[in-house]
Amino acid sequence: MNPLNLDQVREYVNENIVDFHQRRIRSLEELELRKLLTKNPYLFKAKNIATAGELISGLLDAFLSSSEEKLFGDFLEHLAVFIASKTCDGHKSTAPGIDLEFFNKGIHYVVSVKSGTSWGNSSQQKKLEEDLRNAVVRVRQSKRGANIQPVLGICYGKTRTSYVRGYLKVVGQNFWCLISDNKDLYTDIIEPIGHRAKEHNEAFLFEKSRVTNRFTKLFIDGFCEDTGAIDWVKLVEFNSSNYDLDRFLS
């Protein structure tokens, strides 16, 4: 492999982390209260939420947690492709479900990159197996006799390297080392990822406060009683009312 220039990694991260923060803000700007209210209302009732502001803050945090995991996962996957492009002429794969292909020490790697270990349900995992198998077949058709290794690469976590249903599962430090030959890369990328984080987060929190206030007002107008109490029945009806079972059981 070619030695990795960490300055290039820092430059890439500094330029592209901005997109992650911009997408965070955009996800807030495009959010509608009706989408937020699809979250589990029973959970918040069980937690004894009593004020509209507290409920909206909790719903918003739950939405952002899943949204940001996806957004940052995209960033990490792109970072992995960039690093492989520098160390071993890796490239973004055109095969469905495959993110990266690279060649090292006589082995052609086809890699599906995920951000964390809890990345998919059983049907999604079966689809991954199928995508990796198909990618191996495609490479073998163009490169007869090639040594091809399908890989599930996961950007963070401590799970040990293992063979799983025909592919190699590589996690955390081992994954970053696989694409760089640098055992310390997983910690080297921490500092540039935090580039201007405080500044970006302040802009995000400002937008979040605006959305929280706006949604709280809308929620009070639509889902609170004249006394000011949350109308939980009305909220659950909005969230889950869909009765049509009689059409199927009569």
Language-model features, listed with the residues they occupy:
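Hydrophobic, Leu/Ile/Phe/Ala-enriched alpha-helical segments that form helix-helix packing faces
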Residues: 13, 17-24, 80-88, 132-143
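Interdomain/boundary linker segments immediately adjacent to catalytic/signaling cores
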Residues: 1-75
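Catalytic cores of nucleic-acid endonucleases
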Residues: 115-180
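Conserved catalytic cores of phosphodiester-cleaving nucleases, focusing on short active-site segments
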Residues: 84, 99-102, 106-119
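Short, surface-exposed recognition loops or helix-turn segments adjacent to catalytic cores
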Residues: 93-101, 151
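A broadly used, surface-exposed interaction patch
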Residues: 63-93
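Domain-level recognition of nuclease-like catalytic cores that cleave nucleotide substrates
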Residues: 153-250
